[in-house]
Swiss-Prot record:
It comes from the Eukaryota. NDH shuttles electrons from NAD(P)H:plastoquinone, via FMN and iron-sulfur (Fe-S) centers, to quinones in the photosynthetic chain and possibly in a chloroplast respiratory chain. The immediate electron acceptor for the enzyme in this species is believed to be plastoquinone. Couples the redox reaction to proton translocation, and thus conserves the redox energy in a proton gradient. It is found in: Plastid, Chloroplast thylakoid membrane. It is a peripheral membrane protein. GO terms for biological process: photosynthesis, light reaction. Keywords: 4Fe-4S, Chloroplast, Iron, Iron-sulfur, Membrane, Metal-binding, NAD, NADP, Plastid, Plastoquinone, Quinone, Repeat, Thylakoid, Translocase. It is an enzyme of class 7 (translocase). This is NAD(P)H-quinone oxidoreductase subunit I, chloroplastic. The keyword Chloroplast applies. [4Fe-4S] cluster 1 binds at C64, C67, C70, C114. Its EC number is 7.1.1.-. It comes from Dimeresia howellii (Doublet). Its cofactor is [4Fe-4S] cluster.
Length: 166
């Protein structure tokens, strides 16, 4: 009869412990009730990216002097710069410039070290395609100005600011 009493006491202790754990979880759940939702309805709502966001690279063909600094500072030697030396003026003439965003790691070194500021990072991050070869952007695709998320009237933008606790 003595082992039966200890089993009953252990069962009671386990029940109290389980009830306490469930109560702690319930209190955490109740503390999150008055907070704003974290998730967004993505295609219809988009977060406004920060100024330092590193999205698609924008390229200005007229500013580029074909110095190939972007290729040298890129950790994966990604930008492809084709140029021709003009012997009469002894300067390089840019023929083609392309970046494969399927390989790019968006580190921003090319933008940071460009001496003529012909490269810049945009807020555009929707680069998904069904064919990976479509991610190879030439100077025409890189020169396309990005569509601002704020200007798109079909999408509700949400400012991504940390909550200020009072």
């Amino acid at each position: 009869m003595f082992p039966m009493v200890t089993e009953f006491i252990n069962y009671g202790q386990q029940t109290v412990r389980a009830t306490r754990y469930i109560g702690q979880g319930f209190m955490i759940t109740l503390s999150h009730v008055n907070r704003l939702p974290v998730t967004i309805q993505y295609p219809y709502e988009k977060l406004i990216t920060s100024e330092r966001f590193r999205g698609r690279i924008h390229f200005e063909f007229d500013k580029c002097i074909a110095c190939e600094v972007c290729v040298r500072v890129c950790p994966i030697d990604l930008p492809v710069v084709d140029w021709k030396l003009e012997t009469d003026i002894r300067k390089k003439r840019l023929l083609n410039y392309s970046i494969d965003f399927g390989i790019c790691i968006f580190c921003g070194n090319c933008v940071e070290y460009c001496p003529t500021n012909c490269l810049s990072m945009t807020e555009e991050y929707e680069l998904s395609t069904y064919d990976r070869h479509e991610l190879n952007y030439n100077q025409i695709a890189l020169g396309r100005l990005p569509m601002s998320i704020i200007d798109d009237y079909t999408i509700r933008t949400i400012l991504n600011l940390p909550e200020i606790k009072t």
